[in-house]
Amino acid sequence: MRHLLALLMLAAGPTFAQTEDTPEQTPAINVVSGNPAAVNIDAGTGQLGELIGLTPDTGFRLGGVLLADFNWLVTGGKEPGKTGWNFLFILGGNVDLDKTIGLPGAEVGSQFLLYKGYDVNGQAGSVLGYNSLEASPPLGRTELYQLWWRQALLDDRLTIRVGKSVPTIDFTNVLAPIPVENEPFPVPSLSGLIYTPAFVNPTTEGAMPGYYDSAWGVTLNITPIEQFYVNWGIYDGSLASGFTTGDHAFPHFNGTYFMIAEMGGTWKLGEDELLGRAGFGGWQQTGNLTNGTITEDGTYGFYGFAAQTIWQETGHADESGQGIIGFFQWGINDSETMPFNGFMGAGATAFGVIPSRPNDTIGVGAAYGWLNPNNFQRDHELMLQTYYQAQVFDNLFVQPVVTYIKDPGASPSYSDAWALSFRVTVLF
């Protein structure tokens, strides 16, 4: 059950999630994120590097992830019967500068991203987005996804990361766990849901950089005690004015900024010490934001999330553990131009429910967004999603996904939609 419990540690992001592997340790994999590019700072498991001799003791890490899915809009939406596919490839490497050149607490990292796909969310008329691999246009990208320097200070209680990165990894990230007791979990998640609200709070969408529009900026993390953290970040804010920050390799500071801060912590409930965690944050976007004839001078918002172990079963030393974890999200903003003004979401994941398949998971999720009346004629969109994620072998996972979209928000003329997806994830 130790692996299941580790999935519920602080979601303070990668700034203090960099645990050191030893030659005796083997990266453990439990549930894999429906979109690892959105919630994990390290690409894949690092086994690609080990194949060419880059073992953890060398200070070098090379890994990657490949995702591909097929989607069928069975009925409803904008284009019922339509199909589409998505393909994502990420290759990344890190260098521990302490091990390589003797610079304590320093690390550099970089990732390359290749994406190609279809407007499957547009086919369904979904503003929330039932498939997180499809983000904003263009729908074909080759880009420098990340390039950063991370410096740990004060016994890792303060870390600073400077460069091009993905803020949704550090902020609003309800799904990302943190390793405990020096156990490496390179690509775990609290859920395998694939819909977009699981990875970016809809009330920040259009302003907050993330997958796949990463941005240049600075991220600070403070962890005075193990059970509490504070994160703060400031980034290039030109995404809100329509500039695609992800597919531009160099900084593009035009006087607008996206600033965000988050604090959170963990707890244990009852005799079984059921782990839970929660976070709360606020953000501000500067600059003139426009939508048609409407203009506003910046905007701001608040969000929160929580996760709790609901049930766990111990005594399965040969398995990853059995249990159920639930999570909750919310967000609001004061924007006149962004797509959503409010959001609530929740979900649950069952781990190891089939004794002979300890690394399979079953999950459900619900997302409800209040649409900005300046942008849409409908005032809301509701999405329900369920999946079964199966580990075929080692680092290969497959998952069928069923999504129901009630009142697709793009147009009041679109009827309720049903979509089927089949995703394959390969980690290396």
Regions found by a protein language model. Give the residues of each.
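Surface-exposed loop and membrane-interface regions of Gram-negative outer-membrane beta-barrel proteins
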Residues: 72-87, 101-146, 153, 243, ...
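Membrane-embedded beta-strands of outer-membrane beta-barrel proteins
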Residues: 91, 147, 160, 218, ...
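Outer-membrane beta-barrel "beta-signal"
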Residues: 416-428
